[in-house]
């Protein structure tokens, strides 16, 4: 059987990414698995020397084909910092943002070439990314640009709750101006395709409303009747099992209890808050609509605890395992 290899990007090296990657790859189930880290080898060794990460072998390779996977060995394709000795933990730095960008770019190239079958990303810092001149709102938009993907969406994934977003990194004030029937219908379609890929035969998809009580028949806004309902009607006509618009304050609980397989959230915090409340340590961020599987730990760089040994690796480990499963 063909080995499915996953590339793991370091994210911002001044954050918890280097720590949680090495911790995750030292766990049972991932120790010795077909995984390749793309990041600054000097930074990984620096954390290991401080006793922050397990004492495993960090083996440098130039190509994925050179890897010989075995327990106790982590293979690293080195993307060096310009000044590794100048890197400071927990601080926004241009060289850290540039490294995070280069790691994602390298992993994307490997995935598009078929050298790896999926990528799992550790968190990057958006301010550092911008400071380095890479003006993307986050991983999702960066990956879409690198892969020339037009129809894509952010999925947050746990065993009991799955959420896909119509919009993500946009000011709430601007969100309503960009909301369209076409975009909502596209995201419903992405949700249906994604759920079928992960094993759902007839996915049940709920569409959350925009306004309180999903507009209450126009009393609190008309986006539901004017924008969402036509998208739902069109999706149903294509054979999709879609419900809504549903009141946002109850639809996530209904999905959590098994009534729906995925919720279409309208904007960033509408989808993120319930999922992070219920699955902060085991939630996974997935970019649906790319030509390959991309997963990520569902948290940020945690600069406040960077390089202290306090970072928990559960979400990173779950994201890597899911990438292996879906690849």
Curated annotation (Swiss-Prot):
<feature type="binding site">
    <location>
        <position position="213"/>
    </location>
    <ligand>
        <name>a divalent metal cation</name>
    </ligand>
</feature>
<dbReference type="Pfam" id="PF04166">
    <property type="entry name" value="PdxA"/>
</dbReference>
<feature type="binding site">
    <location>
        <position position="169"/>
    </location>
    <ligand>
        <name>a divalent metal cation</name>
    </ligand>
</feature>
<dbReference type="InterPro" id="IPR005255">
    <property type="entry name" value="PdxA_fam"/>
</dbReference>
<comment type="subunit">
    <text>Homodimer.</text>
</comment>
<feature type="binding site">
    <location>
        <position position="294"/>
    </location>
    <ligand>
        <name>substrate</name>
    </ligand>
</feature>
<keyword id="KW-0479">Metal-binding</keyword>
<feature type="binding site">
    <location>
        <position position="276"/>
    </location>
    <ligand>
        <name>substrate</name>
    </ligand>
</feature>
<comment type="function">
    <text>Catalyzes the NAD-dependent oxidation and subsequent decarboxylation of D-threonate 4-phosphate to produce dihydroxyacetone phosphate (DHAP). Can also use 4-hydroxy-L-threonine 4-phosphate as substrate.</text>
</comment>
<comment type="similarity">
    <text>Belongs to the PdxA family. PdxA2 subfamily.</text>
</comment>
<dbReference type="GO" id="GO:0016491">
    <property type="term" value="F:oxidoreductase activity"/>
</dbReference>
<feature type="binding site">
    <location>
        <position position="285"/>
    </location>
    <ligand>
        <name>substrate</name>
    </ligand>
</feature>
<dbReference type="GO" id="GO:0046872">
    <property type="term" value="F:metal ion binding"/>
</dbReference>
<keyword id="KW-0119">Carbohydrate metabolism</keyword>
<feature type="binding site">
    <location>
        <position position="268"/>
    </location>
    <ligand>
        <name>a divalent metal cation</name>
    </ligand>
</feature>
<protein>
    <recommendedName>
        <fullName>D-threonate 4-phosphate dehydrogenase</fullName>
        <ecNumber>1.1.1.408</ecNumber>
    </recommendedName>
</protein>
<keyword id="KW-0560">Oxidoreductase</keyword>
<feature type="binding site">
    <location>
        <position position="140"/>
    </location>
    <ligand>
        <name>substrate</name>
    </ligand>
</feature>
<feature type="binding site">
    <location>
        <position position="139"/>
    </location>
    <ligand>
        <name>substrate</name>
    </ligand>
</feature>
<dbReference type="GO" id="GO:0051287">
    <property type="term" value="F:NAD binding"/>
</dbReference>
<keyword id="KW-0520">NAD</keyword>
């Amino acid at each position: 059987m063909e080995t499915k290899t996953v590339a793991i990007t370091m994210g911002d090296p001044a954050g918890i990414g280097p720590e949680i990657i090495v911790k995750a790859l030292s766990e049972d189930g991932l120790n010795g698995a077909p995984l390749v880290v793309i990041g600054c080898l000097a930074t990984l060794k620096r954390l290991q020397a401080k006793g922050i990460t397990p004492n495993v072998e960090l083996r440098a390779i130039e190509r994925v084909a050179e890897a010989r996977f075995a327990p106790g060995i982590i293979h690293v394709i080195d993307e060096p910092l310009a000044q590794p000795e100048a890197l400071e933990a927990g601080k926004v730095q241009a060289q850290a943002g540039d490294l995070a960008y280069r790691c994602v770019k390298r992993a994307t190239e490997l995935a598009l070439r078929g050298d790896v079958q999926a990528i799992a990303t550790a968190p990057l810092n958006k301010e550092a990314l911008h400071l380095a001149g890479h003006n993307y709102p986050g991983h999702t938009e960066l990956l879409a640009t690198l892969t020339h993907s037009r129809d894509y969406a952010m999925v947050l994934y746990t065993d009991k709750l799955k959420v896909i977003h119509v919009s993500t990194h946009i000011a709430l004030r601007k969100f309503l101006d960009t909301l369209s029937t076409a975009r909502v219908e596209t995201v419903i379609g992405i949700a249906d395709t994604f759920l079928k890929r992960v094993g759902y035969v007839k996915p049940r998809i709920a569409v959350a409303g925009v306004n309180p009580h999903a507009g209450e028949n126009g009393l609190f806004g008309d986006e539901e009747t004017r924008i969402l309902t036509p998208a739902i009607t069109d999706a149903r006509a294509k054979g999709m099992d879609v419900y809504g618009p549903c009141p946002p304050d109850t639809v996530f609980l209904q999905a959590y209890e098994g009534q729906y397989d995925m919720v279409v959230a309208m904007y960033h915090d509408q989808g993120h808050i319930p999922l992070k409340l219920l699955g902060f340590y085991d939630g996974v961020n997935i970019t649906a609509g790319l030509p390959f599987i991309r997963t990520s730990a569902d948290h940020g760089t945690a600069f406040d605890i960077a390089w202290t040994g306090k970072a928990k690796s559960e979400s990173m480990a779950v994201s890597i395992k899911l990438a292996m499963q879906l690849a």
